[in-house]
């Protein structure tokens, strides 16, 4: 995998060519000061939201105690930086997409941080919703700091223009998402995306799903992407219509799900212990899904549920982060 392959999978590199078969989206350049803010791991203070009205007098003794909790004159007041011009553009884009969006950077979405949101979802309605997810996500940090981590070429890293991608929010059923692997412009493998769960309809409709994805690939994807080797994700809705979700590099940086990269690169044993019919259909991609006999696995995102910020909270090393987090939750509840 080379650096150019990674660049070709940036959202803005492929979206103009596949706009008609994917979810409506808006791409906004990410200002340098916003990037710096997102990479600053010193605090969970989140900007993008007006502070709630403050009372001139405390309503109770408890509130008075809270206000006077720290009178150390050396204690710094933590305030979130504001980006009014960028915030306006983001809110206009969100409104144009129906009021709710799925956010991501050039490559990654903050899927590992869904747990921190009030609704345990990546659904965002404001810039502060987006900032909370981004600042809590290792995936987003990796986009910023290690986009070419698995590339084999030694050329200098290209300059990246980072962008905020806002996708119209759609309620997608995890059991209808599939990852497709393409080698030399040939679809060689299809894997259930949410492989930690068993979905009865996938097992029963396997051949139909495979044919549907093959038809979509031949009509809309094959020979149209910038590389010969790549990975793409699709969603098949209840009517059987296929939607393109994303492109990823063909290599270790991308999760191979129910395949191994050794299998995909060599194309050996792709059908494995699957049906003889599959093995005989040499022109058909291998299709893998979680069988009912397989023990349901924990979500791969569970390991991301305790970021350092919360380890600091549990050990009492950073009380400011707890205050900031509780204030943010209170603001969200008041807005709701």
Swiss-Prot record:
The keyword Cytoplasm applies. InterPro entries: CDC123. The modification Phosphoserine is found at residue 60. It is found in: Cytoplasm. ATP binds at residues 104, 107, 109, 111, 167-170, 177, 179, 193, 233, 246, 248. Keywords: ATP-binding, Chaperone, Cytoplasm, Magnesium, Metal-binding, Nucleotide-binding, Phosphoprotein. Pfam families: D123 (PF07065). Mg(2+) binds at residues 246, 248. GO terms for molecular function: ATP binding; magnesium ion binding; protein folding chaperone. GO terms for cellular component: cytoplasm. Widely expressed. Expressed in spleen, thymus, prostate, testis, ovary, small intestine, colon and leukocytes with the highest expression in testis. GO terms for biological process: eukaryotic translation initiation factor 2 complex assembly. PANTHER family: CELL DIVISION CYCLE PROTEIN 123 HOMOLOG (PTHR15323:SF6), D123 PROTEIN (PTHR15323). ATP-dependent protein-folding chaperone for the eIF2 complex. Binds to the gamma subunit of the eIF2 complex which allows the subunit to assemble with the alpha and beta subunits. Interacts with the eIF2 complex gamma subunit EIF2S3 (via C-terminus); the interaction is direct. Interacts with the eIF2 complex alpha subunit EIF2S1. Interacts with the eIF2 complex beta subunit EIF2S2. Belongs to the CDC123 family. This is Translation initiation factor eIF2 assembly protein. It comes from Homo sapiens (Human).
């Amino acid at each position: 995998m080379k650096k150019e392959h990674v660049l070709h999978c940036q959202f803005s590199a492929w979206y103009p060519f596949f706009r008609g078969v994917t979810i409506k989206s808006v791409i906004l350049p990410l200002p340098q000061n916003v990037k710096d803010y997102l990479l600053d791991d010193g605090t969970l203070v989140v900007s993008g939201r007006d502070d709630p009205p403050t009372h001139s007098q405390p309503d109770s003794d408890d509130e008075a105690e809270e206000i006077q909790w720290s009178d150390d004159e050396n204690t710094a007041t933590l305030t979130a930086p504001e980006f009014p011009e960028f915030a306006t553009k983001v809110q206009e884009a969100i409104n144009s997409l129906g009021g709710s969006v799925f956010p991501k950077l050039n490559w990654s979405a903050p899927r590992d941080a869904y747990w921190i949101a009030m609704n345990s979802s990546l659904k965002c309605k404001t810039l502060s919703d987006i900032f909370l997810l981004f600042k809590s996500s290792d995936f987003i940090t990796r986009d910023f700091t290690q986009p070419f981590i698995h590339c084999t070429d030694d050329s200098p890293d290209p300059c990246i223009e980072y962008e905020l991608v806002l996708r119209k929010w759609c309620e997608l059923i995890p059991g209808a998402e599939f990852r497709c692997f393409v080698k030399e412009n040939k679809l060689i493998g299809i894997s259930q995306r949410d492989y930690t769960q068993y979905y009865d309809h996938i097992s029963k409709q396997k051949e139909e799903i495979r044919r549907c994805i093959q038809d979509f690939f031949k009509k809309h994807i094959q020979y149209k992407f910038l590389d010969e080797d790549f990975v793409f994700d699709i969603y098949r809705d209840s009517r059987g219509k296929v939607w393109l979700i994303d492109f990823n590099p063909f290599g270790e940086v991308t999760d191979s799900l129910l395949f191994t990269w050794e299998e995909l690169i060599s194309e050996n044993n792709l059908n494995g212990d699957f049906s003889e019919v599959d093995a005989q259909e040499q022109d058909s991609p291998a299709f893998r899904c979680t069988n009912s006999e397989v023990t349901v696995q924990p979500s791969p995102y569970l390991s991301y549920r305790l970021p350092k910020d919360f380890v600091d909270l549990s050990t009492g090393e950073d009380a400011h982060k707890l205050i900031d987090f509780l204030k943010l939750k209170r603001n969200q509840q008041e807005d709701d």
